[in-house]
Amino acid sequence: MGLGLLLVLAGSPGEAKVGPRAAVGVTISVHNDAAVPWETIRNAEEEASRVFREAGIDVEWANCRGASMVTVAAEKSRSCVESTFPKHLQLRIVKRSIGLRPDVMGISFLSEDGSGCQADIFYEGIEGLRQKTSASLASILGDVASHEIGHLLLGTNSHALRGIMRAVWGPDELDRVTRRGLFFSEKESEQMRGKLGSAEARRKDELWASSGFLGD
C-alpha cells in the first residue's frame, strides 16, 4: 500500500508553526539512486531536520551512496540494510516513478496495519517543479522527504487539510517551502513523538531484561 504526494497548482489554507518539544529520535538511511549532488542531499537533510526538529524529533542521517559518506564500511552496510519500525527508516531517492503520474513527487509503503519502513521520492519531478518556483531544489527535496517520512510515522489516512501533510501542494505550500515555513501540525507532531517514544521505551525495557539485572 502506498501513500503519495501530489503537487499541482491549487490554493490551500494556512498552518500554524509548532513549537519545539522534548525530542525523541529517528534514524533515516538515504539511498541516493538518482546520483543527486552531495551538497544538495546535505542541504535537503538540513531542511528535513529543521521540519522534524520543530515537531520535537531529532533525525540522524545515514547516507548510503556517494563519496562523502563518513561511516566505516561495515557500519555503512549495516545501517543501509537494517530497518526497525519506527526507529530506523529507509528513504530512497530515485530518478522517476514507475507507473505513477509525473506530478507525484513521492510515495511511502505501508502494510495493512499502517506500519512501514520505506519511502521513495522522485528526483526528476522535483527538478521539474524547481523550474516553476523560487524555492531551492534542496528545500523542495527536504520537504517532500519530510512528507513521505511523515506517512511512515503517522500511518494510514495521514493526509491533512493543511500543512506539510496536505495531499495536494499548491502555490501556498510552495511559497511556504520558499520561506521555510512548512510544518507538521501539533496533533501530527504529538502522534509521531508518541510512536517513537513508545518504541524507545520498549527498547529500553528489552535491553534491561536481556541484561539479567533483576533489581532489589
Residue ranges with predicted function:
Residues 24-26:
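Short structural boundary motif marking the start of a folded domain
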Residues 17-20, 29-46, 107-135, 139-140, ...:
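Metalloprotease/metallohydrolase-associated module, dominated by Zn2+-dependent proteases
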Residues 20-22, 85:
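Solvent-exposed loop and beta-edge segments used for protein-protein assembly and interaction
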Residues 10-18:
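Boundary at the C-terminal end of the N-terminal hydrophobic targeting segment
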Residues 1-10:
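Bacterial N-terminal signal peptides
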Residues 38-152:
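Metzincin-family zinc-dependent endopeptidase catalytic domain
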Residues 9-11, 55, 157:
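Hydrophobic alpha-helical elements and their junctions with loops/disorder across both membrane
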